[in-house]
Amino acid sequence: MHRVALRGRARNYIVAKIFFDTNILVYTVDKKDREKTRTSREIIKSVTQNHSPVLSTQILQEFYNATTSKLKIDKIVAKNLVHNFRNMEIVVIDLIMIEQAIDISILFQLSFWDSLVVEAAEQANCSYLISEDLNSGQRIRGIEIVNPFEKEDIFFK
């Protein structure tokens, strides 16, 4: 059993599968916002040590693209950063998932790309999706959205 701080109270629970959105990974190497860099690194470290972190092929592609195009990180360095995620569970996007993501986008009024993230998290049986792009606290198909940059949210410990 592990403990998680939930709005100030510790609770015991079984290890959770936690899906990371691209922005959380990008902040780990973005030097423009030190607070988000620190928070992202802490969350990823904590989840990796205490839970089961999950990504998808979409997240890895977006991470590589954002780090090389927006952050101007050298392509070989960015490739090595992607390689560092090899020990996490990686969900491979397929046609059925794309079709499901379209349904999610229609039902929940989300962008297709955000819907594909939700679908990948659902396929991996994740309890939480860590992102600053979706509505924190919202539950979509049983997955709770968590924005780690909002103080009232869950911080995994």
Task: Set out the residue ranges of the language-model regions.
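Acidic, metal-binding active-site segment of PIN/NYN-like and related structure-specific nucleases
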Residues: 115-157
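Short, well-structured N-terminal submotif of metal-dependent ribonuclease cores
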Residues: 1-55, 70-76, 152-157
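Glycine/small-residue-rich phosphate/adenosyl-binding loop
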Residues: 64-86
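A general alpha-helix detector
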Residues: 24-25, 62-66, 81, 100
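Active-site neighborhoods of divalent-metal-dependent phosphate/nucleic-acid chemistry enzymes
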Residues: 90-132
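Hydrophobic helix-cap positions at the C-terminus of alpha-helices
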Residues: 46-47, 85, 104
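Acidic active-site catalytic centers that drive phospho-/nucleotidyl reactions
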Residues: 21-23, 62, 114, 133
